[in-house]
Amino acid sequence: MKLLHRFFSNEASGGIILIIAAAAAMVFANLGATQGLYHAFLETPVELRVGVLEINKNMLLWINDALMAVFFLLVGLEVKRELVQGSLASRQRAAFPVIAAIGGMVVPALLYLAFNYQDPIARQGWAIPAATDIAFALGVLALLGSRVPVALKIFLMALAIIDDLGAIVIIALFYTSDLSILSLSVAAGAIAALALLNIFNVRRTGIYILVGVVLWTAVLKSGVHATLAGVIIGFFIPLKEQDGHSPAQQLEHVLHPWVAFMILPLFAFANAGVSLQGVTLSGLTSMLPMGIIAGLFIGKPLGISLFCWLALKLKLASLPQGTTFRQIMAVGVLCGIGFTMSIFISTLAFASMDPQLIVWAKLGILTGSLLAAFVGYSLLKVKLSGQVQPV
């Protein structure tokens, strides 16, 4: 029991479980004996009905849209804490991840287009390498445990949130034609209600969660990625301590083990099972996957590092407290883990075309993400060698 307690108390444990879950998914998705069971689990229909409201999704979408909204709620709480009283609590430090995220979206997209500019069909996938999978990036970072400065973790979180927001805007503008104005109006009303609760210092977390469920449902029905609702809820829950009680910090403490040891491993298991059927060396070396690999593995760190360097030189932003520029560059490599959001964009970009394009895109995403994960982890391990953060 002591050994088990020590394992779950170790900051790296969540990352280890996530990697095991992802590896298990790859095995299950590619073994003939388990392939059918794996896909049957993901396609299991789950229906929720309350009066006239009906949400009917398969297991994969419930994990990605509902459980991951809880993960994004935790991320929102942590980023808010650092913006208000932590490593991003100045305008210049808060601007740093914003500028980094812009570079991390623009340069990978341009690099992808450099590979595929002559192919009008492949060009439609330009946004694929612009995305960062925050869950997997944080999971790999967690493998380094207490050596990671809190400010570096928060920088990655903030950058990835902005990256995700950018991806959601790109999807809405370029890959979605049926947004629901009614649902977006309900979502706007729910956000206004959350703002009023915060302004009037309502400190009962349950009320925020109740309004948050309305927000999540409206965002889901609108056609926009529903996980965005989690970040918004987290930003409105009061952080300020009164009578020794902070609603935001208390909720953060409650959510952390559930997210690390249940939600993220489930997410990894549900999304990492990429079938390698039909994959060939000639397919891997074609312009489409090569553009994605280059965008994720080279474009991401290059864009983040270049824009951060310019921001520092022009004094538009400053480094997060307790971090170095070399650590930021290493995190930039880790941001090349595109994975689930990149796969989602690829299915939208090529859904009405040759299905083989999606297979090639997934192959490029998987290869680029694995390279980014391995090299990013290795670089950070070197850059953080000997560092242990105080508890």
Swiss-Prot record:
Keywords: Antiport, Cell inner membrane, Cell membrane, Ion transport, Membrane, Sodium, Sodium transport, Transmembrane, Transmembrane helix, Transport
Keyword ATP-binding included in the entry's annotation: no
Top-rank lineage group of the source organism: Bacteria
Cysteine disulfide links: none
TM ranges: 14-34, 59-79, 95-115, 125-145, 154-174, 180-200, 219-239, 254-274, 292-312, 328-348, 357-377
Gene Ontology terms for molecular function: sodium:proton antiporter activity
Location of the protein in the cell: Cell inner membrane
Main location: membrane
Record protein name field: Na(+)/H(+) antiporter NhaA
Lineage, top ranks: Bacteria, Pseudomonadati, Pseudomonadota, Gammaproteobacteria, Enterobacterales
Name of the gene this protein is made from: nhaA
